[in-house]
């Protein structure tokens, strides 16, 4: 049958709010509509465009139920790993907007495992979001700079500066250098805000290594006076 509302993530976020200090802000994270589409199996809709739209509507419904949150990260590794075809590229911005429009929070579309191809990047730029996220650990980060130079970017950016798949903990100085490198490469672009994070989801990191990386990112953010 059709995709239907679950509320599971909203429930997890409600529980998370109980752990926050009074002045702490909640950040929510979801798969982006294209990556969820790419990883899901369609046994009902029978049409890629309809299935893609249904997934975006489903995610939008989930977001609408979220408790108050300051930032929503939509994770879109599949935009790099399995880039959309031309038809889905043209539907990409609308799908992202379907999700992002259901929150008043700042929405970040974070991509990783490398750089986006030019057409996908250009279409993603049409989405009404606060920031796009870039993998600065990947070897093809020069291609990311090329996209930004050619098509521009948002007024804020999310930078994946720590390796989310390697237990080696980078120093705050190394992470700060990666931020400085990025800013130096595009001097004409001034950002209202930078979000700093691991480049990928740190699923496979031991908890202690994950915490050490977060501490290093926070220290780098303190140097940059940006948001981690």
Predicted segments, located by residue:
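Domain-level signal for soluble alpha/beta catalytic cores
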Residues: 1-228
């Amino acid at each position: 049958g059709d995709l239907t509302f679950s509320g599971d993530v909203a429930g997890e976020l409600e529980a998370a709010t109980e752990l926050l200090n009074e002045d702490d802000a909640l950040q929510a994270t979801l798969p982006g509509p294209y990556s969820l589409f790419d990883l899901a199996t369609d046994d009902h809709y029978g049409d890629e465009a309809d299935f893609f739209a249904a997934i975006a509507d489903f995610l939008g419904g989930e977001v609408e139920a979220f408790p108050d949150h300051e930032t929503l990260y939509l994770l879109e590794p599949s935009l790099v790993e399995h880039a959309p075809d031309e038809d889905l590229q043209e539907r990409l911005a609308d799908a992202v907007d379907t999700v992002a429009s259901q929150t008043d929070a700042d929405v970040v579309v974070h991509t990783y495992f490398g750089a986006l191809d030019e057409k996908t990047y250009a279409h993603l730029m049409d989405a009404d979001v606060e920031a796009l996220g870039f993998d600065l650990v990947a070897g093809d980060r020069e291609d990311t700079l090329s996209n930004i130079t050619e098509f521009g970017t948002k007024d804020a950016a999310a930078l994946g500066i720590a390796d989310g798949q390697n237990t080696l903990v980078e120093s705050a100085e190394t992470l700060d250098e990666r931020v400085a490198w990025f800013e130096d490469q595009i001097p004409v672009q001034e950002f209202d805000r930078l979000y700093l994070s691991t480049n990928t989801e740190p699923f496979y990191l031991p908890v202690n290594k994950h915490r050490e990386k977060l501490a290093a990112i926070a220290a780098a953010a303190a140097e940059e006076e940006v948001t981690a």
